[in-house]
Amino acid sequence: MSFTVKVKEELLSLASRDKNELSAMIKMSGSLGLASSGLTLSVTTENAKIARHLYELLSDLYQVKSEIRHHQKTNLRKNRVYTVFLDQKVEEILSDLHLADSFFGIEAGIDQAILTDDEASRAYLRGAFLSNGSMREPDSGKYQLEILSVYLDHAEDLAALMRRFLLDAKTIERKKGAVTYLQRAEDIMDFLIVIGAMEAMAEFESLKLMREARNDLNRANNAETANIARTVTASMKTINNIAKISDNIGIESLPVDLQEVAQLRIQHPDYSIQQLADSLSRPLTKSGVNHRLRKINKIADEL
């Protein structure tokens, strides 16, 4: 499962019922049609769970029953596309969400009431990421979070929403639309907090620290003396084993005393055994630290 999907699944698990979240999803993925009964609304997504979330938002907030349709893409990816189709109270819903103008091309940006309210901004950003958000895998070392908009005005308003939370958001125009993006790891982690993806933020930070620790070890291997290199080699083995434990059963599954040593080793890959011992909440002998590290390595070997 990609990290983007993990974030979206966590957001869906929040079971939010916020009109501003729905507003973003309709604005970014919706289209209008005409039928004999009046206006129709279609909101498309390639994620079945997001389609279900849209269905439930419309039902809970406006007491309407939409229809979830699907078809297969004809390109090589062959992803299934889901459409949430509604032909009841469409004009009333658009008016309530202040979306009618944007659909008729008069206003492509975000409603001022959302732009000036923190909670509304959080919900709107959550809906925007669910609709058209994506992230690079955090362990790739090239950090980027993007949200694709049809119009540049909307992309710039999204950036303004992010800046309300002190995020260094930027925009760029591409062939398929305009992109609002973040490139600093700290901004991406803060964005995940803003939209409520706390578990994803914690995992992102852990992967980031792990990668930085490995990079520090690689640099140390090239620059330090033979004695330090031996320490680094042992540290590298332990960090790789900690990464293995994190990927398979989670560091939190370790006993508390081993968790503390594991976190210290990740945060300080260049520390000697003595430095690790001195940094523990309850100072330990070198022999005691070595014993705990051997336990960690043994647990990893048994996975």
From Swiss-Prot:
NCBIfam families in alphabetical order: DNA_bind_WhiA
Keyword Cell cycle recorded: yes
Top-level taxon of origin: Bacteria
InterPro entries found in the cross-reference section: Homing_endonucl (IPR027434), Sporu_reg_WhiA_N_dom (IPR018478), Sporulation_regulator_WhiA (IPR003802), Sporulation_regulator_WhiA_C (IPR023054), WhiA_LAGLIDADG_dom (IPR039518)
GO molecular function: DNA binding
Keyword Acetylation in annotation: no
Functional summary from the UniProt entry: Involved in cell division and chromosome segregation.
Protein keywords: Cell cycle, Cell division, DNA-binding
GO biological process, alphabetically ordered: cell division; regulation of sporulation
SUPFAM superfamilies with a match to the protein in the record: Homing endonucleases (SSF55608)
The protein's name in its UniProt record: Probable cell division protein WhiA
HAMAP family to which the protein is assigned, alphabetical: HTH_type_WhiA
Annotation: DNA-binding region: 272-303
Coiled coil: none
